[in-house]
Amino acid sequence: MDEVLIGEVIKPHGVQGEIKVYPITDNPKRFRKLKEVILVQNQEQRRLKVLHANVHQSEVYLTLEGINTRDKAEAIRGWAVKADRDQVPPLKEGWYYFELEGMQVYEGDVLLGTLAQVIQTGANDVYLVKGDKGEICVPALKTVVKHVDVAGKRMDVELPPGLIDGEELR
């Protein structure tokens, strides 16, 4: 089953094993619906049942089965928090960031590079594309992004004039 990164364990909270999680989402309330999480560090992976999820503004606190002391919570500090993809609610429109990252970005037949990061700017997202000749920031606009093939890991773009200095990436 596909796993999705949803956060990172920041620190223990209290003495009964509750953990504070840094959520990687713009809607932390999604954590309330989780039945299970996967904690990952290096090659170690632990699947744990979510007993309780408390969300206060942008802060997330989880109580997990088997993590019932501060020492046990401290032992998982810094671990990645993942969920099975079927536990991640669908978006109203568009794609998940993790589906876009790693895509090969083309303009026509020319490979510009790999989509390395989705940057939220407020107005519109920007795709950071890293290629052999450097990095470019591609605005996530319908006028620029012409086609996205999630299964094929390919994005086709038509860059606006002047976005690349001297055409060095083409």
Curated annotation (Swiss-Prot):
Gene3D superfamilies: PRC-barrel domain, RimM. It comes from the Bacteria. This is Ribosome maturation factor RimM. Keywords: Chaperone, Cytoplasm, Ribosome biogenesis, rRNA processing. Its main location: cytoplasm. It comes from Desulfitobacterium hafniense (strain Y51). It holds the Pfam family RimM. Binds ribosomal protein uS19. One of its GO terms (cellular component) is cytoplasm. The PRC barrel domain binds ribosomal protein uS19. SUPFAM superfamilies: PRC-barrel domain (SSF50346), Translation proteins (SSF50447). The gene is rimM. GO terms for molecular function: ribosome binding. Residues 92-163 form the PRC barrel domain. It is found in: Cytoplasm. Belongs to the RimM family. InterPro entries: PRC_barrel-like_sf, PRC_RimM, RimM, RimM_N, RimM_N_sf, Transl_B-barrel_sf. An accessory protein needed during the final step in the assembly of 30S ribosomal subunit, possibly for assembly of the head region. Essential for efficient processing of 16S rRNA. May be needed both before and after RbfA during the maturation of 16S rRNA. It has affinity for free ribosomal 30S subunits but not for 70S ribosomes. GO terms for biological process: ribosomal small subunit biogenesis; rRNA processing.
